[in-house]
Amino acid sequence: MEYKTYKIADLIDEIAMGPFGSNIKVDCFVDEGIPVLNGSNLDGFALSEKSFRYVTPEKADSLKKANASRGDVVITHRGTLGQIAYIPQNSKHDRYVISQSQFRVRCNEKILPEYMVYYFHTALGQHKLLSNSSQVGVPALARPSSTFQQIEIEVPSVQEQRRVISIINALQAKIDCNNKINDNLQQQAQAIYTAMFISNADLAWEQGRLSDLITVKYGKDHKKLAD
């Protein structure tokens, strides 16, 4: 597989920061409308749509640069650094508003958004993404939009990108399936525990204290191990 090295600036058509905090106040939120993203929405490769707050379409229109749509990549620059996710083509909403702690990019024809996200989820990608971070106070990336554009990454042809994405997606689908199985088993185990020890507990069982069944012994400090 042949790679070419590009700066991010050569791989994107657009980059935009989230709105100033004063532009989205608590009283801007409504029960339904255009979703406003937060860190919990960027906890994987693709956008997670588990929980949102909303603003009206008119408010979203007034924050045009902060509007993200399908195919865009969203990155956290303040708070939980290292988060990066793409908005899939089958997302629930046509557009979203990124938060004041995020910025978004729109890829050009040289790179697929999924490939960019997968790259920055690798150890090398995370190192490059966080190389200009500051841990003083709230963790943040210094000059996020400009420093991100100067990052150099290795990119194969679009055809090879699609092949890589296909392999990763297949593996991720298996991981997701296994996670669902594990969740189901945990729920079954909890239900059995509740049925056996709470709902259907035998009234004839003897009650006592844990101290009646165990002996507690404490470890020693390393300096006293020779005693």
Regions found by a protein language model. Give the residues of each.
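A generic structural signal for short beta-strands and their flanking turns/coil linkers
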Residues: 33, 51, 99-101
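Sequence-specific dsDNA recognition surfaces
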Residues: 5-26, 40-73, 211-227
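Extracellular/periplasmic catalytic domains that process cell-envelope and extracellular macromolecules
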Residues: 29-30, 96
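Residues on a specific face of well-ordered alpha-helices
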Residues: 6, 114, 118, 122-123, ...
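A short beta-sheet element
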Residues: 38-39, 57-125, 137-138
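Non-catalytic DNA-recognition/assembly elements of restriction-modification systems
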Residues: 1-20, 152-222
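A short glycine-rich beta-alpha junction/loop motif
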Residues: 2, 95-103, 134-165
